[in-house]
A protein has these predicted regions:
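Short, well-ordered beta-strand segments enriched in hydrophobic/aromatic residues
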Residues: 14, 24-26, 61-65, 558-560, ...
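Solvent-exposed beta-strand/loop surfaces of large extracellular or lumenal domains
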Residues: 34-50, 574-595, 702-726
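Aromatic- and carboxylate-enriched substrate-binding clefts and catalytic-loop regions
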Residues: 29, 36-39, 242-506, 537-539, ...
Length: 742
């Protein structure tokens, strides 16, 4: 920390965080450290090269890509490396234990962020809101704001606060908090992709889920018992509908459907796991599920003080209640021996995850964190760490996800599939989320795209199955969930056309798994989400911020939901359903029929990896991969990613990649497949790939100069068009070049 010059009672400090980020903190003597800092939410980064100098009443801190000038009165100017002013403030007013900050930005700036603070818009100028976790209205607020102008601001606070982005005063962003210091991380980055990279480098990248979590998750009816749930498993297999996760809703625990504490046991009437079967999963229903390749998810609710465990992990002492007997106590009545706590659930010495280990040992691999009570206000509660709810409320769902994720990892050594409806800044590094009890329409889509602007990638919602549009959207998400909580949404109970649509899209998603998994890994490395708003990918596209129902699904697939038109960015695009190519820069009608519920357009030059039909993903390496090439006159490439699907070995380089390039020149299209690099346990010995070219005038092909057999056929998502030709090759130690000739 650099102590800056200060007049008055404020303490002004600055800290170089990275080459593109500087932290500024203006505090009173009594302001405590933010819970996010105290509890290790931020990544530990090496100190970058920086300079610091005093110029009169100002302190100037410079890192490679940014410069912060702070006045002794709390005024500041934040600039990029060229000296261009990005944002500035005439001063931060500390008041009533909190602060009132007025920050100027450039006229005409487009501003994004705040997570789930609104589901009505993407761009935020002229918008004001309170950053406070709420049921339905705001499940996952995020205190990060950034602009296409090249600046970003992360408020390091969990206190209830309000943000006004030019709604009350043009080109002025006002942040008012009821408590805590004005503590911000300021970022300088030239574009959104770079900004998300820098932001998630500081706060944490999106978690990489188990491979099977990117398949289909089915939440069973709460009235189910063991027989009904096992029948659901069998029906997915019998109906030839791929699925990987089966989730239990309230009712799986004994004594209470809504069990808020740590005394849970299996409900022996609905989901019996007899004591004599403990330690022998093969004899239980969980073993039977595993044998047909399902992973069990358990529903949880909570009313438990997680702050004690956070204090312990932060290195602070948490003293359990002591039993104290007085020598003069004749009766030794235990009611008087310890403190009388209003909280009857929390056990000071027991981390919340501790009681779940036995269920993990029995075979549970996934936990659904319901909103019930984690997102509720607790206005009269004093938490164990000394915080009131004004400071703890936003923090609670974040540390809940943290303790669940790290608890599972530490207990098993495997990746966690923890998904929750509640969250706060940094949620992406611990859990997947779904859009809460708001269905699967256009507003949940807006929520997902807004969360993408906060670097959160593993998003989903409850799939709508009453129309093909809802099914289309439900499967074109980072992860897919069908909730059957109190309904009869099983696909085999749908009308015939909807049932066929569900089966079609489920199989389509599973064929697309290598692409989705590669994009998920890209998110985990860069902070760039799988689902991307149009303005994130095409910031110069006219009215991109108004296109809230369409989005890029990874690098190369454009889709939309619940609208009759889709606007194509500049360039050429291929209709995935028909194979027809069209020019971009225009709006076209969305044509749906039969099982098709929405559009899919492929960017010219794309290389989409797919695999064959399968009933589950599991953790196995991708085999029989087809590279679907949509040739362009510009050379394009794709790097396929794969790993063991379940461990954290990828963090240490245990993964493999295959790069493929393609370019069309005149009547020739040249595709080169590079040798596989890297390794992981369980990967296939041979590298055999099919290269499928989406061009129907091909008459021949060579592989490394020798004539090769080609076969005509359909694409990965269309049938009956016959607009592709394929060549299968084995790649060993040298690149393989395929030349297609028209």
């Amino acid at each position: 920390m650099i102590n800056c010059k200060s007049c008055g009672q404020n303490i002004i400090t600055a800290e170089p965080i990275s080459d593109s980020c500087i932290r500024l903190r203006i505090a009173d003597v009594g302001d405590k450290e933010c819970g996010m800092s105290r509890y290790g939410i931020y990544e530990k980064l090496p100190t970058p090269e920086f300079s610091s100098e005093e110029k009169g009443e100002k302190t100037v801190i410079t890192v490679k890509n940014a410069r912060l000038e702070v006045g002794s009165d709390g005024s500041f100017t934040f600039s990029d490396a060229s000296g261009k002013t990005l944002i500035s403030s005439a001063g931060i007013e500390k008041q009533r234990g909190g602060f009132d900050a007025r920050i100027s930005y450039r006229d005409g700036a487009k501003i994004y962020g705040l997570g789930d603070a609104t589901r009505r818009r993407i761009e935020k100028t002229g918008f004001a809101t309170e950053i406070w976790v709420r049921n339905i209205r705001c499940y996952i607020p995020v205190s990060f704001i950034h602009s296409h102008d090249g600046w970003g601001l992360l408020l390091n606070s969990t206190w209830r606060h309000a943000v006004d982005i030019g709604a009350s005063e043009k080109d002025i962003m006002r942040i008012v908090a009821r408590g805590g210091a004005f503590d911000v991380y300021l970022f300088a980055a030239p574009d959104t992709h770079s900004m998300l990279f820098e932001y998630t480098r500081v706060i944490g990248r999106p978690i990489m889920l188990p491979k099977w979590a990117y398949g289909l998750s089915f939440v069973a009816n709460q009235a189910n018992d063991i027989n009904a749930t096992m029948n659901d498993c069998l029906n997915f297999r019998r109906e030839d509908i791929p699925c990987d996760i089966i989730g239990l809703e309230p009712g799986w625990t004994a004594n209470s459907r809504y069990h808020f504490g740590t005394d849970k046991e299996w409900n022996q009437k609905t989901y019996p796991v007899p004591g004599w079967q403990k330690g022998d999963k093969s004899a239980t229903f969980l073993g039977a599920m595993e044998r047909i390749h399902f992973h069990l998810s358990l529903w949880l609710c909570i009313e438990y003080d997680l702050s004690y465990e956070e204090e312990r992990q932060a290195g602070y002492e948490v003293k359990p209640d002591e039993i104290i007997w007085d020598d003069d106590d004749y009766i030794h009545d235990s009611h008087f021996a310890t403190a009388a706590r209003l909280d009857g659930n929390t056990k000071l010495e027991e981390p919340f995850f501790e009681h779940l280990k036995k269920f993990v040992d029995d075979g549970a691999e996934c936990f659904k964190l319901d909103g019930c009570h984690q997102i509720d206000d607790h206005p009269d509660r004093l938490w164990g760490n000394g915080m009131t709810d004004e400071e703890m409320h936003n923090l609670f769902p974040l540390i809940y996800a943290k303790q669940m994720s790290l608890g599972y990892r530490n207990h098993t050594g495997k990746r966690a599939m923890i998904y929750t409806s509640g969250g706060y800044t940094g949620i992406q590094k611990y859990a997947a989320t779904w859009a809460g009890d708001t269905g699967g329409g256009a507003k949940p889509l807006s929520s997902m795209l807004n969360l993408g602007y906060a670097g959160h990638s593993n998003v989903s919602c409850d799939m709508e199955t009453n129309c093909t549009a809802g099914i289309h959207f439900g499967f074109m998400q980072t992860w897919s969930q069908l909730s059957n909580w109190a309904y009869w949404n099983q696909p085999w109970f749908l009308e015939d056309e909807l049932k066929e649509s569900f089966r079609f899209y489920a199989k389509l998603r599973y064929r697309l798994a290598p692409y989705i998994y590669t994009m998920a890994h890209k998110a985990a490395q860069t902070g760039l989400p799988v689902m991307r708003a149009m303005s994130m990918e095409y910031p110069d596209m006219e009215k991109a911020d108004d296109l809230g129902c369409q989005y890029m699904f990874g690098d190369d697939i454009l889709t939309s939901a619940f609208v009759d038109e889709i606007t194509l960015p500049d360039g050429k695009w291929i209709n995935a359903w028909t194979g027809e190519k069209t020019d971009g820069g225009k709006t076209v009608a969305v044509c749906t029929s039969g099982v098709i519920g929405g559009p899919l357009y492929i960017k010219e030059g794309a290389i989409i990896p797919t695999t064959g039909d399968r009933t589950y993903l599991g953790t196995k390496a991708f085999e029989g991969v087809t590279f679907n090439v949509y040739p362009s006159e510009n050379e394009t490439s794709f790097t396929l990613y794969d790993d063991d699907g379940i461990s954290y070995g990828y963090e240490n380089g245990d993964f493999a990649e295959v790069k493929i390039t393609a370019k069309k020149t005149g009547d020739k299209t040249v595709v080169t497949v590079m040798p596989r690099t890297g390794a992981f346990e369980g990967m296939s010995e041979k590298c055999i790939y099919t290269v499928k070219l989406y061009q129907n005038d091909i008459v021949g092909a060579t592989v490394d100069g020798k004539a090769a057999e080609i076969s005509a056929g359909d694409g990965w998502c269309n049938t009956g068009t016959g607009k592709t030709v394929s060549v299968t090759v084995e790649v060993k130690d040298s690149p393989v070049t395929i030349e297609f000739k028209a």
